[in-house]
């Protein structure tokens, strides 16, 4: 099993690479790519960790050597948020980066499962899909927007509020991956209930958690370590499913049947070919249903922006 991390010299990429070096199954290969010249050195640094995961680093304009034979590609390349920016402000820079890298994936490892971490995810996933489609290699079961950070934040905040162990809480989060499009299904957590006010406040905190980190870092960065952990969790789940483990379920942002929007985050059963089944989002509370209806315009607009970037 070979996993490639693109954008591996950045804050998320280095954290993700460290976690994968420690947690990938024995015998796996990990390849790191970034435009930054430090990348081969990051791989050398990580190579001193005594796990049976082979690691190599590549830098420069060409990601091809890192992508050859990859089963899973995780893309965290791009610029990070600064105070006062929201994820959509990143679009102008990151759209071109994702387009370029996905074009290289289409040529080099078109059958790989691709997880997009680069924000704005609502839009960059649509860009990736259109690039793969143009190249004639698009498989909607193999392209994911990694929204796992919304899930782990929800788990943490719910556990804090309700005095639970964070490891016993699993909150499904649907919709997209920015602002109002992030919708935690708090009504679906077994054995936990919320007042309407608690649900509204907690939903808002989860939606704005990224901004909380950006402001706390006072201009020194965005959520890199928690995002690295979230991306590692998703990547490792994908690897387990590709290797034949049954019953692996994660929420991610994928193309579905278009019931709500072309791309939508929902619980997925993962399998040997990527998405095995898009699971139902279940019954929503009145607050959740209202939030879902209210976000769809924003989500569809974000998606359209990505489609137009490639097709216009």
Swiss-Prot record:
<dbReference type="InterPro" id="IPR023958">
    <property type="entry name" value="Malate_DH_type1_bac"/>
</dbReference>
<feature type="binding site">
    <location>
        <position position="81"/>
    </location>
    <ligand>
        <name>substrate</name>
    </ligand>
</feature>
<dbReference type="InterPro" id="IPR022383">
    <property type="entry name" value="Lactate/malate_DH_C"/>
</dbReference>
<dbReference type="InterPro" id="IPR036291">
    <property type="entry name" value="NAD(P)-bd_dom_sf"/>
</dbReference>
<feature type="binding site">
    <location>
        <begin position="7"/>
        <end position="13"/>
    </location>
    <ligand>
        <name>NAD(+)</name>
    </ligand>
</feature>
<dbReference type="InterPro" id="IPR001252">
    <property type="entry name" value="Malate_DH_AS"/>
</dbReference>
<dbReference type="GO" id="GO:0006099">
    <property type="term" value="P:tricarboxylic acid cycle"/>
</dbReference>
<dbReference type="GO" id="GO:0005737">
    <property type="term" value="C:cytoplasm"/>
</dbReference>
<dbReference type="InterPro" id="IPR015955">
    <property type="entry name" value="Lactate_DH/Glyco_Ohase_4_C"/>
</dbReference>
<feature type="binding site">
    <location>
        <position position="94"/>
    </location>
    <ligand>
        <name>NAD(+)</name>
    </ligand>
</feature>
<protein>
    <recommendedName>
        <fullName>Malate dehydrogenase</fullName>
        <ecNumber>1.1.1.37</ecNumber>
    </recommendedName>
</protein>
<feature type="active site" description="Proton acceptor">
    <location>
        <position position="177"/>
    </location>
</feature>
<keyword id="KW-0560">Oxidoreductase</keyword>
<comment type="subunit">
    <text>Homodimer.</text>
</comment>
<feature type="binding site">
    <location>
        <position position="87"/>
    </location>
    <ligand>
        <name>substrate</name>
    </ligand>
</feature>
<feature type="binding site">
    <location>
        <begin position="117"/>
        <end position="119"/>
    </location>
    <ligand>
        <name>NAD(+)</name>
    </ligand>
</feature>
<dbReference type="GO" id="GO:0030060">
    <property type="term" value="F:L-malate dehydrogenase (NAD+) activity"/>
</dbReference>
<dbReference type="InterPro" id="IPR001557">
    <property type="entry name" value="L-lactate/malate_DH"/>
</dbReference>
<dbReference type="GO" id="GO:0006108">
    <property type="term" value="P:malate metabolic process"/>
</dbReference>
<feature type="binding site">
    <location>
        <position position="153"/>
    </location>
    <ligand>
        <name>substrate</name>
    </ligand>
</feature>
<dbReference type="Pfam" id="PF02866">
    <property type="entry name" value="Ldh_1_C"/>
</dbReference>
<dbReference type="InterPro" id="IPR010097">
    <property type="entry name" value="Malate_DH_type1"/>
</dbReference>
<comment type="function">
    <text>Catalyzes the reversible oxidation of malate to oxaloacetate.</text>
</comment>
<feature type="binding site">
    <location>
        <position position="34"/>
    </location>
    <ligand>
        <name>NAD(+)</name>
    </ligand>
</feature>
<feature type="binding site">
    <location>
        <position position="227"/>
    </location>
    <ligand>
        <name>NAD(+)</name>
    </ligand>
</feature>
<dbReference type="Pfam" id="PF00056">
    <property type="entry name" value="Ldh_1_N"/>
</dbReference>
<feature type="binding site">
    <location>
        <position position="119"/>
    </location>
    <ligand>
        <name>substrate</name>
    </ligand>
</feature>
<keyword id="KW-0520">NAD</keyword>
<keyword id="KW-0816">Tricarboxylic acid cycle</keyword>
<dbReference type="InterPro" id="IPR001236">
    <property type="entry name" value="Lactate/malate_DH_N"/>
</dbReference>
<comment type="similarity">
    <text>Belongs to the LDH/MDH superfamily. MDH type 1 family.</text>
</comment>
């Amino acid at each position: 099993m070979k996993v490639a991390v693109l954008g591996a010299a950045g804050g998320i990429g280095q954290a993700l690479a460290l976690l994968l070096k420690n947690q990938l199954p024995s015998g796996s290969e990990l390849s790191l790519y970034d435009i930054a010249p430090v990348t081969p050195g990051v791989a050398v640094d990580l190579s001193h960790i005594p796990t049976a995961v082979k690691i190599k680093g590549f830098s420069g304009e060409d990601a091809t050597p890192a992508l050859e034979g990859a089963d899973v590609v995780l893309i965290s390349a791009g610029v990070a948020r600064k105070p006062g920016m929201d994820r959509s402000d990143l679009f102008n820079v990151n759209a071109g980066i994702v387009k370029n890298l996905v074009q290289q994936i289409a040529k080099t490892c078109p059958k790989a499962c691709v997880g997009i971490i680069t924000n704005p995810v609502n839009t960059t996933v649509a860009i990736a899909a259109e690039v793969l489609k143009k190249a004639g290699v698009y498989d909607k079961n193999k392209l994911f927007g990694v929204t796992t950070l919304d899930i782990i934040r929800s788990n943490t905040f719910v556990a804090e509020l309700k005095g639970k162990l964070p490891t016993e809480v699993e909150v499904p989060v649907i919709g997209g991956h920015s602002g109002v499009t992030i919708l935690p299904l708090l009504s679906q957590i077994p054995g936990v209930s919320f007042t309407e006010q608690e649900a509204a406040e907690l939903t808002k905190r989860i939606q704005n958690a990224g901004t909380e980190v950006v402001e706390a870092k006072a201009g020194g960065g965005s959520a890199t370590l928690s995002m690295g952990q979230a991306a590692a969790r998703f990547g490792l789940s994908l690897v387990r499913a590709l290797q034949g483990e049954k019953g692996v379920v994660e929420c991610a942002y994928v193309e579905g049947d278009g019931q709500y929007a072309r791309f939508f985050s929902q619980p997925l059963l993962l399998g040997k070919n990527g998405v095995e089944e898009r699971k139902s989002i279940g019954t929503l509370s009145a607050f959740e249903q209202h939030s879902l209806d209210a976000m769809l315009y924003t989500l569809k607009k974000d998606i359209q922006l990505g489609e137009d970037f490639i097709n216009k």
